[in-house]
Amino acid sequence: MQAEERKTTMDQNETQWDKLLKIRTTGRDDSHSDQYRYPYEPTPYCVLERLANSGMIGKQNTVLDYGTGKGRVCFYLSYQTRCRSVGIEYDERIFSGAMENREMAVSGARTCFVKADAGEYPVPKEVDWCYFFNPFSIEILQKVLARIYESFYEHPREKILVFEII
């Protein structure tokens, strides 16, 4: 398959999943990115399909998506695995997109979104999966990991961190 054909197939997959989930998450947005917070760029559905099909996430789990953007990870995983999901986003405009999506999304009832600075956000005790898709710099990541460790020590449990770095 040629590169152009692969891109067209991938774009169709992105659009089809958004339509099925009743959300709008495609595209990239660099308008509020800087050296610490990276552009809005949703995780490709092919990556989420592999994660969901791993069988490691189920309805007993709660996923925390750092830099959730418009909520694609939360909506997809909640739909496919029946898990609960929490999305953290600092950008007001993009956060508004996640909230609009939640109103229409088929899995909206199992998702929630918080507008917050990821480095300051206290990790809820029920969270056992943390997902990162290239959301921010190492400086912010260090603060986030400190919060995750705090939560783990306060409420010991198995926790899984998933990093997708581009």
Predicted regions mapped to residue ranges:
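S-adenosyl-L-methionine
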Residues: 1-58
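Conserved class I S-adenosyl-L-methionine
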Residues: 60-67
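Glycine-rich SAM-binding Motif I of class I
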Residues: 71-75
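Conserved SAM/SAH-binding beta-strand->alpha-helix loop
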Residues: 91
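Conserved SAM-binding loop
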Residues: 98-99
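Conserved SAM-binding strand-loop segment of SAM-dependent methyltransferases
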Residues: 108-117
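A short SAM/SAH-binding and catalytic strip from SAM-dependent methyltransferases
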Residues: 129-140
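C-terminal substrate-binding/active-site "lid" region of AdoMet-derived donor-dependent transferases
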Residues: 139-166
